[in-house]
Amino acid sequence: MKIVFAGTPEFAAQAMRAIHAAGHEIVLALTQPDRRAGRGMHLQASPVKEFALEKNIPVLQPETLRRNNKDPEKQQQAEDAYRALINTNFDAMVVVAYGLILPQEILDITQQAPRFGSFNIHASLLPRWRGAAPIQRAIEAGDAKTGVCIMQMEAGLDTGDVVLTADLAIASDETSSSLHDRLAALGAGLIVDALSLLQDGKGLSRTPQPALGVTYAEKILKAEADLDWSLSAREIDARIRAFNPFPGAISNLNAETIKLWKSRLADEDAYSEAGPIGAVIGFSEDGVFVRCGDGVIEILEAQKPGGKKMNAKTCLQSVDAPEKLLCFQTKA
């Protein structure tokens, strides 16, 4: 099949590579413009663009797909993308973490017979966690499972009919980083399955999303990273794992902002020492035990400003503390 692919990050690039490896021809790639990143703030291409260039796939990088934009340059970019889609011979469009809204006129192009339409890979079990950050929000909420849906796209935010789905369990030590990688692999395989069914003439059964159970995964804000130690140990552990790798959970410890990367729930009975909320009440071989609003958490990996990630015990023992009292400041 001939595919137009729209996506930007590594999650999308993995699906793109799988589609290519399955023998489908990607005839056009849409991705976000190059962005400045890294310590040198150099312009960097997206993983999708890098793969497209490697395979000599034409690439467009409009800042918007809305042709009614008031900025003449952006309007021209949108016009060029619109014309490219009209003039490209393709069977279906696959959209994965693209980062731009597809106007209805773009969706209409993909639905013109004999085309099959646009399909989106979404990293949740819809209708739970529609929106920008389904992986992080699933971990933060303490969900026991999540998965991937292949959705027939429409104008609403992740509201289209689901055509294929696959789920997996969320491990107790799961981080957003590890869950991202597992879901990327799951989604890549699932979109290949969907395209194979279309190619073989078997079609895809469309299941409308139920009205009940809708939740929204709002974009993660850096301000959320500041931990509130009055929460339960279970909630704090979930946030530390959800915010790894971005934005990284933080907390002030004796006037130093510490990033907390890895944690687990502790046996409170074994560490029942008294102490205020946020206090370090004990040490393990590699970690430290911190009193929470309800329960105790073991911090296993931490990072001081300008330093490297290291086991939490080594990291925190180097913090200057009067009378060796280590106490995280709870969020106001």
From Swiss-Prot:
User: Which keywords does this Swiss-Prot/TrEMBL entry list?
Assistant: Protein biosynthesis, Transferase
- InterPro entries from the entry? Fmt, Formyl_trans_C, Formyl_transf_N, Formyl_transf_N_sf, Formyl_transferase-like_C_sf, GART_AS, Met-tRNA-FMT_C, Met-tRNA-FMT_N
Query: Matching PROSITE patterns, A to Z?
Result: GART
The reply to whether Magnesium figures as a keyword in the UniProt entry is no
Enzyme class, top EC level, equals transferase
Q: Where does (6S)-5,6,7,8-tetrahydrofolate bind?
A: S124, L125, L126, P127
What are the annotated disulfide bridges? none
Instruction: Quote one Gene Ontology molecular function term.
Output: methionyl-tRNA formyltransferase activity
Keyword check for Protein biosynthesis, yes or no: yes
- Please state which protein family the record places this protein in: Belongs to the Fmt family.
Name used for this protein in its record: Methionyl-tRNA formyltransferase
Which species does the entry assign this protein to?
Polynucleobacter asymbioticus (strain DSM 18221 / CIP 109841 / QLW-P1DMWA-1) (Polynucleobacter necessarius subsp. asymbioticus)
Q: What gene is this protein translated from?
A: fmt
